[in-house]
Amino acid sequence: MQRKFLRKKALSLRSRALCPQEIKKQYPYILLFHCSGLTSRQWRQIKNILCTIKGKTLFKPKEKKQNILPNNQGDWIAQLASSAGPTCILYLAKEAPNNTWSQLLPSASYSQNLVLLYGQDRSTVFNHMDIKKATTLETTSVFQQLFGFMFLPGACFLFLVEQANGRK
């Protein structure tokens, strides 16, 4: 009985999935990044903060049923999901505050555990090779802080642990 209920619930969730055009309309900021070198506990702490952001967050896509990225750039998602480290697709809504990422940005040393694979700011698309270009865009209030976070993920984790210990 429980299994049947769960199967129906999964089917109803799949039927409500947004198509790429709807995602593009609702969420002008789309980010896909891959994280390696973190333990599952470290990743969970980062993920919990990301879940508080206004938007939609999907973690570790298992298979490519449909292309959820615009411009048919989703061919490598299935390969990425089976690689080491978690993957996150983050859709930010228009009303995401400019300081959304400030809680994730400590001042610390350089680290390369988090890699931006795909990003979109309305009609501007960029990947990890375009980070310097993307930081010069006029509409980078959210992204500028994200790029800082992406270059400091190890330090970010320490910051998150300190924040969590401070809340207890």
Swiss-Prot record:
Main location group: mitochondrion
Keywords of the record: Mitochondrion
GO terms for cellular component: mitochondrion
Subcellular location: Mitochondrion
Protein name: Uncharacterized mitochondrial protein ymf1
Taxonomic lineage: Eukaryota, Viridiplantae, Streptophyta, Embryophyta, Marchantiophyta
Gene this protein is translated from: YMF1
